[in-house]
Amino acid sequence: MLPFLFFSTLFSSIFTEAQKQYWVCNSSDASISYTYCDKMQYPISINVNPCIELKRSKGLLHIFYIPRRDLKQLYFNLYITVNTMNLPKRKEVICRGSDDDYSFCRALKGETVNTTISFSFKGIKFSKGKYKCVVEAISGSPEEMLFCLEFVILHQPNSN
């Protein structure tokens, strides 16, 4: 009995359940999905229309989220990995508290954020490979993590 308890305790962290993967979209050259990287797994819905093509693509990013805190001060910590190379951490301030670019920056705790943001990759050339981006959303004073998502983009450019 003692060996069973010992080994089950020792190996319990090795045999953990896999994270549920949420599919965002597929395009002719990319596949995009995400998983939660925190234990909260606070519901968020992300949609891209049209799906990202990493060759001079533009489109709309749709986000549906009910924040657990006011979004007067919001920033993202971005941890990006290209294939196996880790890029330096990037802090992207989204909401400063005044003169903000996005309407959701004034959203209060519990209010629905249902927003659409345009994007463009014009002039950026992405190499073939696996891109990972961990996004930590931090808000408030004192700072608190709202959510953490790990995006995976598999880029397989067409040889045409």
Swiss-Prot record:
Residues 1-18 form the signal peptide. The lineage of its organism: Eukaryota, Metazoa, Chordata, Craniata, Vertebrata. This is Lymphocyte antigen 96. Residues 119-123 are annotated as: Interaction with lipopolysaccharide. Keywords: Disulfide bond, Glycoprotein, Immunity, Inflammatory response, Innate immunity, Secreted, Signal. Disulfide bonds join C25-C51, C37-C148, C95-C105. It comes from the Eukaryota. GO terms for cellular component: endosome membrane; extracellular region; lipopolysaccharide receptor complex; plasma membrane; receptor complex.
